[in-house]
Amino acid sequence: FTMDETWNGRDIFIRFGGVRSAFYVWLNGNYIGYSQGSKTPAEFNITELVQNGENKLAVEVYRFSDGSYIEGQDTWRVSGLERDVYLYAAPKTRISDFFVYADLNEDGRSANFSVKVDLFNPERFTGKYKIDAVLKGKRVLYKMDYIVAIDSTNSVEFQTTFSKVKPWSAETPYLYNLKIMLTDPQGNLVESFTQKVGFKRVEVKNGNLLVNGKAVMFRGVNRHEWDPVVGRSITEETMIRDIQLMKQHNINAVRTSHYPNQERWY
């Protein structure tokens, strides 16, 4: 692959979405690392090994590993790169993770909402950074910002309550858009993320599973990531086809076999 020079000064990662069953990785003749676990993504920081211009990546895949035993349940034993492999660059000071909590209250209208943002600053750049969180439906429902001095790692949490939200359900899957932004001391946008958010309430009462206060009977199936033509390399089109087939047969729940599925499925 060819390195994009606009990525200079950023941390560069390579991500393997899924490799069965284990693999070693080298970049430009240098050993990067090893991973096993066919359905668990593996990510490596290659900042120190990547070079401007042409780079040579080598991957050695093993069909079986000492983790194969727990993966060998009711499945076809095929091996290789099953999911996407891609590079991405991230700023040195960045949002490392975030968690959204959206809980519909028992009245079915009001809700509690919080966002926890984890920050990463290994080189301890100084100055005041700003973090914005904006939740929007047909209109802006919530907007807040914090000014923080980032240490090596720290977190910021936004919390609020809403008197009225539009609930999410399988019949009316209404979603809000949450945007999280990190701005540096000079006012430059460093990083931003967008996440869909739905407000729902799931509970068990008197032996019944309730979603937003209404009893739901699960009619579920077990699903493997499998295509009769391409095997385990599932595309979005294959996922949509499976969902359409399930909806045609009134299926409303899916057990994703015994392993994590591709993120797109969720």
Provide a role label for each language-model segment.
Residues 40-44, 154-160:
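Short strand-edge motifs at loop-to-beta-strand transitions and within beta-strands
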Residues 102-111:
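Short, solvent-exposed loop/linker segments at the N-terminal edge
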Residues 27, 110-148, 156-158, 178:
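Beta-strand-rich binding/interaction modules
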Residues 88, 147-149, 196-200:
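Short beta-strand edge segments in extracellular beta-sheet folds
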Residues 58-60, 177-181:
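Extracellular recognition modules
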Residues 99, 179-249:
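N-terminal carbohydrate-binding accessory modules
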Residues 29, 85, 176, 213, ...:
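Conserved, mostly hydrophobic/aromatic
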Residues 1-97, 122-123, 139, 253-266:
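Accessory beta-strand-rich segments of carbohydrate-active enzymes
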